[in-house]
Each structure stands twice: as structure tokens, then as C-alpha cells.
Regions:
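Individual transmembrane alpha-helices with interfacial aromatic-anchor signatures
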Residues: 29-33
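Alpha-helical transmembrane bundle and helix-membrane interface signal
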Residues: 19-21, 51-57, 93-102, 160-163
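Membrane interface segments of multi-pass transport proteins and intramembrane proteases
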Residues: 18-28
Length: 318
């Protein structure tokens, strides 16, 4: 709730400056980043300091009987910087593995690494949602799809029987978040009713930054933050398109004296709206004919659904 309020305030200030000062840029980027980093830091520290946020692990208990060693597993709730990672055995990764060189302080180092990744995920996802909110219904529909996937993972991870059967990390009490996830999905679908093309209402940065923040924090709470690049692939590609375009433009301007583009326009969804070979100098001109806004949105939704399915599949591939 605290994260939601902070993101709403951040987005509101951005929208307020755009309307009040007639400034399309709104709040300066550095102030947005400061706000996003602050929220990420608070979430990371809360995960570290709260004694109620734990995960359940199976610990080996070997016993020797009649020259045979029998290994039993006892489930114990532990406070560890553990997360879910695809393509590996048991799907679990302890951040302390990267800080073993710190010796007795490896666990503390693991938590520091976890907090750093939390900050990055919160900033990246909230910014990605903000960039995706450029066409009617695009960010809303995409976020609803992501919300459904997170709700399912949350439900499975909060049930000890289902989590054991599906080999998903069991997090005591996380099942309670399903109610919040359902509210989030319901709000998005209700908003989409009026936000679909042609839109009657718009969320602005107040909504898009908050939606991205909710998705990021939710994924972190259920230890699925490393699945974000797959699940939130639409947000990722929108972010990358802007970064690539800006970096390439600055590089070519410095080298050749004039800035050059890779895409006709960024974020990426705007690239498909523009006519190819029609005066816009860019390396990637396809598609030549502009695609209607409604078709771009639906195609991005379809990609989002496939990404959600792939996210679940990765948990079974080891």
C-alpha cells in the first residue's frame, strides 16, 4: 500500500506539471528515478528486516542405520535471500551464492544484492509500464495479463500442497495476496472497458507508474522478480527500444555530426504506426504500411499472453 501511494504521488506530480505548466515533459527524469529508487529501497529493506517474510526450505537430515545412510528432508521456514529462477534444478537461487567470498557475511551480502536487484526491478518495470502507455488499452490490457499470471503463481506458491507438486517455492501467507491480485486485475479490466480504442478515459503517469510499481513489488514479494524479463517482456522491449534509439542517436551525432535512428519512432509501438520510407531516416523501415492502432494493441496483447505461458513453462524446464 505504501508503494502504491508513493507511485501515485510521483505520477500525480508528473501529470500536474504537464497540465499546470503546459509542459509535455512533466517531471524531470532524474526526479522520477529518485522516486522509483526510493520505493525499491523501502521494499527491499522491508523484505530484509521484517521477521514475518520467510520462505520454506527442505533441509537434509542424514541418519545411519545398519551401514546404510538414510536421508530425510525436514521442511523449515527460513529468512533467506532466495528467489525463483528458471532452467535450473529446484528453480531456486540464493543470492548469497554470489557473495560466498564474504565468508561469514555472505548472507548479509546476499541481502544487499537482493535489495539492489529490487531497486532495479521496481524502477525498470514502473518505467516500462509508463512507456507502454502510449496507445489506447495497451498498458491496461498488458498489465491485466501479467496480473493474472502473478495471481496464479501467488496462489500456487501460497498452498503447500500445490507448491510441492508443482515444485514452486512455498511462501507462507503469500496466498493472502491473491485477493489483492484479483482486485488489481478487476480494476484493470473495468478501466479497460473505457480505455479500449477509442479511449474515453486515460490513466496518465499517475496510473501507469503505479501499475508498473504494483507489478514489480508483487513479483518481488512472491520471489518471482527474476521471471520479470520474460513475463513483462512487452515492458522490457519498450524500455530497450528507447534506450537503443537514444544511445544510437547520441553515438552517431557525436561520430558523424548528425543523429541517426534505428526505429522510425520509439517507444516501439509507435514505430509500427509510422509509414515506412516516407521521410523518416531510420535503419528499420518495416512495416512499410502503417498498422492501425487497434491491431497493434491486440497483437501486443497476444504476445503478452504467449510470454505469460512461457513463464510458466520455464518452471518445468530444468
Amino acid at each position: 500500500i505504501f508503494a502504491i501511494i508513493l507511485f501515485e504521488m510521483l505520477g500525480f506530480l508528473d501529470d500536474y506539471k504537464k497540465i499546470k505548466e503546459h509542459n509535455k515533459d512533466g517531471l524531470k527524469g532524474k526526479y522520477k528515478i529518485v522516486g522509483q529508487v526510493t520505493v525499491g529501497l523501502i521494499v527491499g529493506l522491508t523484505m530484509y528486516l521484517s521477521p514475518d517474510i520467510v520462505v520454506r526450505e527442505n533441509f537434509e537430515m542424514p541418519s545411519k542405520t545398519d551401514d546404510q545412510i538414510e536421508v530425510k528432508y525436514k521442511p523449515m521456514e527460513e529468512k533467506q535471500p532466495i528467489t525463483t529462477i528458471p532452467f535450473v534444478k529446484s528453480n531456486n537461487l540464493n543470492y548469497s551464492w554470489f557473495t560466498q567470498w564474504m565468508g561469514d557475511h555472505a548472507e548479509t551480502g546476499g541481502w544487499i544484492l537482493f535489495i539492489i536487484i529490487t531497486i532495479f526491478v521496481v524502477a525498470a518495470v514502473s518505467n516500462g509500464a509508463n512507456l507502454t502507455d502510449g496507445l489506447d488499452g495497451l498498458a491496461t490490457g498488458t498489465s491485466a495479463i501479467i496480473g493474472v499470471a502473478l495471481a496464479i503463481m501467488c496462489y500456487l506458491g501460497g498452498n503447500i500442497i500445490y507448491s510441492s507438486y508443482r515444485n514452486i517455492m512455498y511462501i507462507p501467507g503469500s496466498g493472502e495476496l491473491v485477493v489483492y491480485a484479483a482486485s488489481f486485475i478487476g480494476a484493470l479490466i473495468g478501466f479497460l472497458w473505457y480505455n479500449a480504442y477509442p479511449a474515453q478515459v486515460f490513466m496518465g503517469d499517475t496510473g501507469s507508474l503505479t501499475i508498473g510499481g504494483i507489478i514489480a513489488v508483487f513479483a518481488i514479494l512472491i520471489r518471482k522478480e527474476l521471471l520479470i524479463p520474460i513475463l513483462c517482456g512487452i515492458f522490457l522491449i519498450e524500455n530497450l527500444s528507447v534506450i537503443i534509439q537514444t544511445s544510437y542517436f547520441k553515438y552517431t551525432k557525436k561520430k558523424y555530426g548528425e543523429g541517426r535512428r534505428i526505429f522510425k519512432m520509439t517507444p516501439l509501438h509507435h514505430h509500427f504506426q509510422k509509414q515506412g520510407n516516407a521521410g523518416i531516416v531510420a535503419k528499420w523501415q518495416k512495416p512499410i504500411n502503417p498498422i492501425p492502432e487497434s491491431k497493434i494493441v491486440v497483437r501486443f496483447w497476444i504476445i503478452g499472453i504467449f510470454l505469460a505461458i512461457i513463464t510458466f513453462i520455464t518452471l518445468k524446464i530444468r
